[in-house]
Amino acid sequence: MVGIDYGTYGTAAAWAPFKQGQPDPGRITLFEQWPGSRIGVDVKTMTALLVKDDREILAWGHSAVQQAPSSRAGRPGSPVRLVHGFKMSLAPRPYPGATSHSEIGLADNEAHPERLITGFLRHVYQTLLAELRAHLPDLEENEIRWCVTVPAMWGDREKQIMRDAAHAAGFPRTEGCLLLALEPDAAAHNAQVSGVQYVGAEHPGRRGSLDGVSRFMVVDCGGGTIDITCYTIDGNGYLVEIDREGIAQGSLYVNRALRDLVLVPKLGGQEEYRRLEQVAPHALEELLRDWEIKKGRVTPDSTDHIWLDLKMSLAKHLSDEVTERLDASQDGDDENIWITADEARSAFDAVIPDILELVDRKLADLTRLTTAADKPDLVLLAGGFAQSRYLRHRLREYLRGRAVVAVTPQPQVDVVEGAVRFAYNPKVRARRSQYTYGTEICAPFEHGTDPLGKLYRSGMGKELCRDRFDVFVNAGDIVPVDKPTVLEFVPVERTDDAMTFTFYRTKEREPRYVDNEGCEEFATCDLTIDLTEAMHLELEKRSVTLHVSFGETELRVRAVLDATGEEYPTTLKFSTR
């Protein structure tokens, strides 16, 4: 079982062997020998690529960042550029002044992110496969189950792009060999084993578990996304997803805010900063990577400055005016850029209110949608950004009296370890459907309700209504995972020798027609059932039964021609239009 936490800033991987009859993998091994990484220090490789002409990959991960300066990446006229954070281009968030430059790790306006994702995952897959075979020489590729995590904020389209990119990168296409897990699901799986640590002076070092907790919320705080999923826990310890939502925010947006609010003014304003991006792009990258390392020092009551290393490669390009101003404000220190404690907090404060608002909204939804004796509710922080003491403090103060805030013991690796546990034994029993899903049918026409333009008279004289929406599941319903919904359909005309199903979705809970505003086809293909072998039967006996089941991140349909028992299984690929 291999778990991959494909993150905006960094990517981690871990594995564990499957043991028959054992419900949990036990010891999980982290991959820590990424190309260009510091052994024993870098748990993750950077989600970065060094590309030439936007097609040829020159380097990936840490190596891409290390080789960028010597390759003149990002310089005027250079065909080479360093990109990272491209995952966020699948669901970009408008941001004032956003560009496709990758400073502080957010290339979130890429035109073709799927190409970059495929290229990066190809190198990850090949590296991990070689590492696994070094430990297990007789291991066959088809004996490995892979689990790649995705943000809960992603919709069907983004998850399908991710699955297609993984397949194109070499991950197996065999059913069940590649799972996609929502990042909060992975964190929740791990927390059930690792336990939690409560936040705040009133809980110094206090540890706890999810045993006895009937409902809780996971706030997965990553580099580019804040994903929230709300759960209840059934009597067997399995998770029932109640609600989920996410936003494009996180640790790397703090970096972007520091650039806009602090560094741009210190280095001479917008125009001057744009000039520096042209003449010293990697020096600015290094400055912000230094901040990435040191921003963990920011606390609610910290007073010390954070000193960012001012390399000569940047200093020599600063204007005289900027150099003099820095010299005067920093007691003559010309080797660093000083960030005051208040300036550092201002970067966090540009991002945290959006997180608090989302948590507040989801906490209200959790209370509205469930009943529980647990008071106050548990809000569990996970992900790399959850290591921020300032974020923990702000959230604890905001929720004081309404919820207890906790973190997982190792926020940086709980998603990847949870991905291994998820692959080993998925514990999500049910999910709340984000959409109403269904298919198009002809139903009996109702005069006074259905428009005459939809009236269809069959060859047998029946008055039918075209374009009716036949529902598989309604938006907001709790849907058991992999438990099929069964529906039976018959042809409209005696001459029909095939039955074609087109699949639709909408946010509307009770849609009547498939052409209602907001209804859309969501699959890349229709499903056609050949009725030739049943044409000798009465019309009612030419029925087709659909078995529709909702998997962890996909919809599966099995159609059966009842007269012969012939099956037409398919996994619906969500449209990436």
Annotate each PLM feature.
Residues 1-24, 79, 195-240, 540-562:
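Gly/Thr-rich phosphate-binding beta-strand-loop-beta motif of the actin/hexokinase/Hsp70
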Residues 77-80, 87-94, 102, 112, ...:
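Gly/charged contiguous loops adjacent to phosphate- or pyrophosphate-bearing nucleotide/cofactor binding elements
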Residues 42-149, 295, 302, 327-330, ...:
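Conserved phosphate-binding loops in N-terminal lobes of ATP-dependent enzymes
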Residues 178-198, 255-260, 350, 354, ...:
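Glycine-rich phosphate-binding/hydrolytic loop that grips phosphoryl groups
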Residues 235, 316-350, 354-355, 430-577:
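Acidic low-complexity intrinsically disordered segments
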Residues 161-165, 388-402:
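Conserved helicase motor "Helicase C" RecA-like lobe of SF1/SF2 P-loop NTPases
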Residues 132, 152, 162-215, 221-222, ...:
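Hydrophobic, small-residue-rich alpha-helical packing segments that form membrane-like cores
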Residues 1-100, 238, 244-250, 256-259, ...:
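Early-domain small/polar-rich strand-loop-helix modules and first-structured segments
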